[in-house]
Amino acid sequence: MLKILLSFIIFVGSNIIHADTVTIQSTTSTRDSGLYKYLLPFYPKYKETQIKVVAVGTGQAITNARNCDGGILIVHDKKRETEFMKNNYGSVIHNLMFNDYIIIGPKEDLAQVSGSRFISRSDSSGTHAAEMSIWTKSGLDPTSFSGSWYLESGQGMGPSLNIATSLGGYTLTDRSSWLRFQNKANHTILYENAQELRNDYSMILVNHARCQNLNYEAAKSLYNWLKSAEVAQLIIRYEINNNNVFYVE
């Protein structure tokens, strides 16, 4: 009887381990916003699908997807997304949602921005790419001032925000990260609602022809659900501290 029971446990455990598995390679901001914890349990196949979210900077997420370490890619850098699709690493792409970037800094130092420290993530993330695009349009290369007023953290949004608040400095952040951030100190939003600060998130289904090790059907099923009208409404309704976080067109 004991042998039969052990065989049954092993059989059941084996089936659980080999359930449909989908890995989402994601930017950190969507994970840190709490969106996945809110959204994914609504997926009709949630209980029978093991969904793993790997949250890293956009650059690393794209590299991971190129290496077939995920069936779905959710990032926010149009230039690198276009290159990913052009090189046939993705089969389809969908404009999932958008929010915006903001510039935060100390409340009492509004008139002295030029003499203060700016903290850059400098981590090849989508936020870092957006920041560098803004600097380029302004005609300034801030890296030539690295170590003086321009500080390159090489870290994620949370640690970079902590550095900014502790040093009384400034940084560019996505709005959702700021809403979730607890250590605001005396910092506030200084610049927002500008067209150049729009932050678009794309979702890409990784090309099965390149990554045949992945469970393509499971990834495709989740991808199709995430781009549905039902999910669009769920995304729009998601809030942090009574503030809308993401929008869908």
Please annotate each region the language model reported.
Residues 4-13:
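Sec-dependent N-terminal signal peptides
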Residues 51:
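Hydrophobic anchor at the start of a short beta-strand
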Residues 72-99:
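Acidic, polar ligand-binding/catalytic clefts
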Residues 20-47, 59, 63-69, 77-78, ...:
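Exported/periplasmic ABC-transporter solute-binding proteins
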